[in-house]
């Protein structure tokens, strides 16, 4: 029993350290509960989708962090100033998501399906950053 406890103590300490480092790496503006997102409607194949608009750096950093759910007919659209290879990750998310990158003309340049959230200390330490295959200005 003592050897098992001795083996688990360093693992527990490492998990706590990873969790603290992960939380410290979240920019302060994303931790604020009062981040407000403008809302809008976009059309995907003639189907309306209500979206929260992440069009500033603090809004993009915060994204859907700490949100418990997202109704099927809603989403968040990340809007960037110019085309680029904008990567996203699922830090402090509570549910998996599909991600779609669009170019300036609205053409799909990349899709990632069922991306898992990173919410435990071990998941946060190895949270994957998804990079699109093409330049985009919008990510849904």
Where are these regions (language model features)?
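Compact, glycine-rich, soluble single-domain proteins
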Residues: 2, 6, 22-140
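Hydrophobic membrane-insertion alpha-helices, especially the h-region
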Residues: 10-23
């Amino acid at each position: 029993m003592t050897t098992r406890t001795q083996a688990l103590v360093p693992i527990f300490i490492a998990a706590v350290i990873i969790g603290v480092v992960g939380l410290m790496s979240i920019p302060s503006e994303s931790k604020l509960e009062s981040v407000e997102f403008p809302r809008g409607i976009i059309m995907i194949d003639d189907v309306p989708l209500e979206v929260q608009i992440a069009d500033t750096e603090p809004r993009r950093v915060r994204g859907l962090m700490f949100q418990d759910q997202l109704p099927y007919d809603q989403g968040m659209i990340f809007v960037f100033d110019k085309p680029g290879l904008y990567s996203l990750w699922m830090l402090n998310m509570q549910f998996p998501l599909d991600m779609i990158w669009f170019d300036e003309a609205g053409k799909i340049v990349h899709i990632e399906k069922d991306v898992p959230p990173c919410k435990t200390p071990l998941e946060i330490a190895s949270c994957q950053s998804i990079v699109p295959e093409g330049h985009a200005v919008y990510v849904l």
